[in-house]
Amino acid sequence: MALLQIAEPGLSAAPHQRKLAVGIDLGTTNSLVATVRSGQAETLGDNNNQHLLPSVVSYTAEQVVVGEQAKHDASLDPANTIVSVKRFLGRSLNDIRRSYPDLPYDFDESNPNSPLLNVTGRQVNPVEVSSEILTTLRLRAEQSLGEELSGAVVTVPAYFDDAQRQGTKDAAQLAGLKVLRLLNEPTAAAIAYGLDTAQEGVIAVYDLGGGTFDISILRLSKGVFEVLATGGDSALGGDDFDHMIVKHFRQQLGLEGALSKRLHRVLLDKAKFAKESLSDNDTVTVDFADDEQKLLSLSISRETFQGLIADLTKSTLRACRRALKDAELEKDEVLEVVMVGGSTRVPYVREQVGEFFGRTPLTSIDPDKVVAIGASIQADILVGNKPDGEMLLLDVLPLSLGLETMGGLVEKVIHRNTTIPVAKAQEFTTFKDGQTAMMIHVLQGERELVDDCRSLAKFTLHGIPPMAAGAAHIRVTFQVDADGLLNVMAMEKSSGVQAEIQVKPSYGLDESQISDMLKASMQNATGDMQARMLKEQQVEAARVHEALQAALNADGAELLSAAEIGTIQASLEVLDIAGKNDDIDAIKQAISAADAASQIFAEKRMDHSIKKALAGHTVDSI
């Protein structure tokens, strides 16, 4: 008798069957695909067990070629062989030509905002070219795993803007992939090393690939990675190391002037071999034939190689220093340094990075594969392959989160449909002179005014140093973890005083309530925007009135005549009346009139302040 299979209601007969998901590193120079098998993340190779797929696509009259063969075609047919297409995603034709003026490609001029490349017998755009690379990786994965994929996590540089991210997503969908998520490359590298569950703190990701260098400074807090700063050089990478060795070889051989394409390619190949061999050897010798088939032999030592690349390496460290400065951090505040990209295998690079940050970089995972491996771990989580106890619930925010600003306005910090976990920060300032506290009112919703949104929490930041209005810098950070728990922290930057609160944004809301809130925001969009513009002008009128009245009280009697004071007071009375009415144009005119009436007063105050500051000082002491 056949046995019946019994399943939980709503589930398949095999509810715990693993789903196949992959992580894809769509790189500028090389691309990879990885998956999690038997609990271990691994990259997948082709039929020749080659894991790195050169990100090169060649178009002929008969076919489209991707990978190693296309890379070989690059020197033979450069106009029809697209290299480093990732640089073109989401960019206009003007952007591309400004950044890369010497490209050998024939671009169609008809639509500069959506660049098209004329290749053999057809026109293609960067999304289509990228999709060829992604299709090759998808087919490799399906052949290796024996089934269709449930989805993929595709990585992008942390600095990619919305257009570049959308281009990447479109390319993946065109390649037949269900995109589970776009993941920042430095975050993927950190996940590969398990840093997402490690001690909280600052992580630097140093990514030196074949053609580009990127440095990313991340902060890990409550399981969420926040990108604090990014930097780098889109025209510096391991290829430049190869060119420095070629230059050295040419000097050894006394070769000046142009080289034949064949000899140039041979020298580049030998330079790459020498670079890689010097990671394990003190000296390397290469043999090759010149154009006259004369056999030549050249040697290069590790010491010489290090001298050749010293300036290039220093350039990457300068970018690291700038990124730390942008993040307002010191080197000793960095907890871990993750190395990404094949060029970080060079011992000299690792030594210099270690010396710069004052700690040994993480290098145990193949730097070529670390991003794809991290992406595959994330993909495995997103398709639900983790046991219940380890299940990470990842979703999107159903409604925007923000806070109240002056005038009862809502400033959105994290917009709806943002994937969680997520962290975002914005800076705010004080409205009044000498203000020492700020009430933080956290709101949820899509409307422009506080009264039309849902109040989540209120807390007060005390201890703000007394300053002039607008001088204090309060950084408010919103963090939503994988369980949808919101943590809001406010910190005054000069003193370091801070306060925070936690709240569950979705608590008490069902789908129908969320839907109603979204409908209301769409139905009232025009009216809400007009109300916001009016409130903003009213707040500005109140700010100008308060600042000008305070200045008059402080210095008016000393610096102005009675007539001048009367003129300013009259403009303030007009401003006060206008600010209480609903005519936006009248408020704007009243603000402009008050500014004009107080112009001479502002100049006198400035002169008075300078004289006061210089009193009792000699030129030499200043």
Swiss-Prot record:
Matching CDD domains: ASKHA_NBD_HSP70_HscA (cd10236)
Signal peptide positions on this chain: none
MF GO annotations: ATP binding; ATP hydrolysis activity; ATP-dependent protein folding chaperone; unfolded protein binding
UniProt-listed Pfam families: HSP70 (PF00012)
Keywords tagged on the record: ATP-binding, Chaperone, Nucleotide-binding
GO biological-process terms attached to the record: iron-sulfur cluster assembly
TM ranges: none
SUPFAM superfamilies: Actin-like ATPase domain, Heat shock protein 70kD (HSP70), C-terminal subdomain, Heat shock protein 70kD (HSP70), peptide-binding domain
Recorded superkingdom: Bacteria
Gene3D superfamilies: 1.20.1270.10, 3.30.420.40, Actin, Chain A, domain 4, Substrate Binding Domain Of DNAk, Chain A, domain 1
Family (UniProt): Belongs to the heat shock protein 70 family.
Role of this protein: Chaperone involved in the maturation of iron-sulfur cluster-containing proteins. Has a low intrinsic ATPase activity which is markedly stimulated by HscB.
This protein's name: Chaperone protein HscA homolog
